Amino acid sequence: MGAASGQRGQGPPSPLLLLWLSLLLLLLPPSPAPALDPGLQPGNFSADEIGAHLFAESYNSSAEQVIFQSTVASWAYDTNMTEENARLQEEAELIWQEFAEVWGKKAKELFDAIRQNFTDSKLRRVIETIRTLGPANLPLARRQQYNSLQNNMNRIYSTSKVCLPNKTATCWSLEPELTNILASSRSYAKLLFAWESWHDVVGIPLKPLYQDFTALSNEAYKQDGFSDTGAYWRSAYDSPSFEETLEHLYHQLEPLYLNLHAYVRRALHRRYGDKYINLRGPIPAHLLGDMWAQSWDNIYDMVVPFPNKPNLDVTNTMVQKGWNVTHMFRVAEEFFTSMGLSPMPPEFWAESMLEKPTDGREVVCHASAWDFFNRKDFRIKQCTRITMEQLSTVHHEMGHVQYYLQYKDLTVPLRRGANPGFHEAIGDVLALSVSTPAHLHKIGLLDRVANDLESDINYLLKMALEKIAFLPFGYLVDQWRWGVFSGHTPPSRYNFDWWYFRTKYQGICPPVVRNETHFDAGAKFHIPSGTPYIRYFVSFILQFQFHQALCKEAGHQGPLHQCDIYQSTQAGAKLQRVLQAGYSRPWQEVLKEMVGSDTLDAQALLEYFQPVIRWLQEQNQRNGEVLGWPEYQWRPPLPDNYPEGIDLVTDETEAERFVEEYDRTARVLWNEYAEANWQYNTNITLEASKILLQKNKKVANHTLKYGTLAKKFDVSNFQNYTIKRIIKKVQNMDRAVLPPKELEEYNQILMDMETTYSIANVCYLNGTCLHLEPDLTNVMATSRKYEELLWVWKSWRDKVGRAILPLFPKYVELSNKIAHLNGYADGGDSWRSSYESKSLEQDLEQLYQELQPLYLNLHAYVRRSLHRHYGSQHINLDGPIPAHLLGNMWAQTWSNIYDLVAPFPSAPNLDATEAMIKQGWTPRRIFKEADDFFTSLGLLPVSEEFWNKSMLEKPGDGREVVCHASAWDFYNGKDFRIKQCTSVNMEDLVIAHHEMGHIQYFMQYKDLPVTFREGANPGFHEAIGDVLALSVSTPKHLHSLNLLSSEGGGYEHDINFLMKMALDKIAFIPFSYLIDQWRWRVFDGSITKENYNQEWWSLRLKYQGLCPPVPRSQDDFDPGSKFHVPANVPYIRYFVSFIIQFQFHEALCRAAGHTGPLHKCDIYQSKEAGKLLADTMKMGYSKPWPEAMKLITGQPNMSASAMMNYFKPLTEWLVTENRRHGETLGWPEYNWTPNTARSEGPFPESGRVNFLGMYLEPQQARVGQWVLLFLGVSLLVATLGLTHRLFSIRQHGHSLHRPHRGPQFGSEVELRHS
């Protein structure tokens, strides 16, 4: 549009400062007015038609001179906005106004009485034009004020800039920066900032100036006989029913606009969601791709009906083909000349400003075409950008110039369009052809032309976003101004009425609160420039009437929207006749000659868009769209972190490219890291550790690089949930956020702690050394000798815990720093975030409380059994149980002491270990059976690569390895392994199923992006294998494997089985709960390094009812003796998994059609159960875990009810048994500790005895006993006293009364994610 672009507000100066500067300029005394050259004054003419002819001829030659000089001055100012040029422009304007005044008054004086009787209609039009003085009616001082107001308003609009928050060095002009942002950004907040800032920085200072301008303009035109300025503007259309005609046209087109609005609103809703788009309300004004929401074609990519069809926006092709600005204008010129119309004269190419200057000049960027009225100098001023939209604008502006060229020989008053809409329509008529796919193909911007319905709908929708979207805006701007000029809209209601019209006609609303301090109409160029706007509404009707007529002249056959009049000289000749007529005849005559009708008519437009009208109606009906905006008062909320977060990227296409690149590069790096990690874990050497640290560093650099890039995205309004979820996950950079030196230190600490744990052993004095796996583990599982168990228990902690303690505080410090840098309160907060639940700690506490009664009954029953075996010296029936007597190094599961606690010892044995050994089972056989279970469910078998590369038993070649069982994903979609020092026993049979559960999970989600290759939450991954193990452990299944002689089935058999399961599952609950309770409190600082061990034992006492068998001090670090603590593996996952595995088991049993008690269910060979499990695993981490939970169980919550149901028979039996024996539930004598005096007995495998911490031959020990008897007794007393004192301090510590917080889960296996 010759005046339909825009510019943006001042950067450093505030709106108020601009306002005061403008007012100050207006208050300065006017400079002396320049005088009009006497030779340009009118002479004497007779007051008749002949005199009028002579008057008009004389006027023409003088007017050309004066207008040329005025236009030159205006051009100089608009292309270099300096104070000097402003002064010269105002002087030239005053001369023109003086010229208009003297000639206008002369015309009134001589011809007002007779002009209506002139026989020459052209002459009558000339005189009527000359006699209208406009601002020249004003006295000189007020005329100068009027000119100054116009210049100041234009200066404010054209030089204003918007600066980023707190960054005055980074400021944006309207062209090109703000226009580009509104066109290309999809960031709600950034768009809002650009929109709000521009409207504030321009509108606020303009308002008082505009009030004064309105008053002076009305004063001027009233003296020409008009009621106000609006009446004068409407007079250009020479129709008494003009306003009614416009209203009729608008209502004729309104249904099409309403359907387009509803369709676009739905598309925006998909992008921005319910928060910012109300499907029954107006659309926020900043989201439509344009500062004024006047055309919406810049959001075509968001609303395109058929995205897979060729892209009709050829901007990228223009750039790729090296189009420059001059070429764009040459292409437009060639279109005109192909129709036999005039080329641009040399002055056009020499003098036009086709690009924004780069020399620092302030210019008026709004595109405009200029006639210098010397019949040879015609120019365009445009800050052109290489875009398809600007290509249309170029044709539009050149249409104005072509009009100038065609009517240049008419007298000056007739050198204008037949009406203002004609002038705006001409270039747009050609643009209708230029934008067709056929024409874009002809000029090399489209590879091929698709002639199918979907491509047509895409094209017409794109055109509708430009043409139909504009109609209500083109209509309302002057509806508002006419109300301002008439006084119907006073200054106190400028903004209210502006938004009333914009909501009424456009169905848009301001995105932020606006009031009467704002002047949002002023943010549109045509308001401060005083350019009438209804011309554009008229032109949008006319251009389709012209297009239809010219296409007919060109012989076009087919749909109107496919017509291209390029190279049609017949169409050119018809158009030329219209242009050459200028203003010489009534526009109705010119229109009739062109189209066959003398009225404005929307039928051609409706015909053009008919296919897309029908398509929009169908789409809206199908989607149940509301046409209109019944909730018209709705307004969107402000974004969070506004305006600080406006620089974040919200382009989902860019985000998709980022995610693809991240995924592709991560797969390679994570595979390399996993290989190096595997090599280290299966052969602990210095060289392997160096390689691992190098790979770790590469992964950290990758994580840091892409995490930093991910943080540049604002995903809050992404509609693609997958992209949103991946980027949020990538934004958490974990340890990679640390500075390089600290990262290196952190990695070294972790490696040192894990290495210390993994290679540790304890040795007898004879040099025989025992590793944790299998030696110490076997002793703890099978020995029933109090002192032997004590020595193993204590020695392991002395060797491992004390070595790790010096490293742990720094590990905690750096872990917290990592958490802080990633936006978390501390390390525990970071770990808990994996569960995506604000109520996680409360939920876990609730689960623990539900299960505590069962644990207390189990604890009391087991304590009674241990009392029978070890006696009252070592077991207090009202106190905690010594931690080394429960068959496991950490007392986490108690199934290894099943022989001591079996409810019915005479019932058949449930432990399959003996049968496995007798039948010659091997570690490989164990895993083959596990693989068979999965495949029997219809799940995936492991590959040959798994069998070739896994480490399924401890190597016999002397290598140091990390024996802790773990499953590995190598991130290439085919390499999955297990590392386990498997022993042939039933416990490891269960663990093998657990590990194979991880492998199955890996295989099911292998095709997801790497970010989603995790469990729905960490507990899910731990639970899958354990679910199958619940079936594997049943007597029925063990019998099917020939590992038990019968399926069992009697009551005693059932209770024995459930007891064995409870020793694994129920005994584990408090242990899995407390480990991260302790670590979270270490991370949050409530447990300090001075009381690590004291608080550890406080929690173990509180939750497990256990005590250390020997005194512990702060020099000890017993948490460090558990793999997951030095290995930095969160543990709450195991608590969670132990809860949810029973929920899964219950759901899978239901799917398998199982009837009867839950503990007897075996899902082996159930394809239905397998499908349910597979569907859940395939989700990986792609959705929040409650959705995965709902998929498998039918509801989204964690619940202990399935576990309680499973153990219900045992619970009833335990309650009855404990009541029968009068057992105490709990440990009221919590201060009690076992007798620490050791019996001096021989230790197996050495033949030596322990005496005062030394290992001696039995004979030496006996001699020593007699010699040091007295000293030994004294030592015993002292030891007992010290023990009592230590535990008194410990038990009265504040931590016992501290409310605990936390989560945990299932069967422990370390996951190796990067």
Curated annotation (Swiss-Prot):
Subunit organization: Monomer and homodimer; homodimerizes following binding to an inhibitor. Interacts with calmodulin (CALM1, CALM2 or CALM3); interaction takes place in the cytoplasmic region and regulates phosphorylation and proteolytic cleavage.
Keywords, ordered alphabetically: Calmodulin-binding, Carboxypeptidase, Cell membrane, Cytoplasm, Disulfide bond, Glycoprotein, Hydrolase, Membrane, Metal-binding, Metalloprotease, Phosphoprotein, Protease, Repeat, Secreted, Signal, Transmembrane, Transmembrane helix, Zinc
Glycosylation sites per record: N44, N60, N80, N117, N166, N324, N515, N683, N701, N720, N766, N948, N1197
Modified residues (Phosphoserine): S1307
Binding-site residues, Zn(2+) 1: H396, H400, E424
Signal sequence, start to end: 1-35
Positions that bind chloride 3: Y835, R1133
Subcellular locations according to the entry: Cell membrane; Cytoplasm
Family to which this protein belongs: Belongs to the peptidase M2 family.
Cofactors named for this entry: Zn(2+); chloride
Free-text tissue specificity from the UniProt record: Widely expressed with dominant expression in lung and kidney.
Record's bilayer topology term: Single-pass type I membrane protein
A Pfam cross-reference name: Peptidase_M2
Binding positions for chloride 2 per the UniProt entry: R797, W1096, R1100
Gene3D superfamilies: 1.10.1370.30
Protein name: Angiotensin-converting enzyme
Keyword check for GTP-binding: no
Binding residues annotated for Zn(2+) 2, in chain numbering: H994, H998, E1022
Active site: E397, H526, E995, H1124
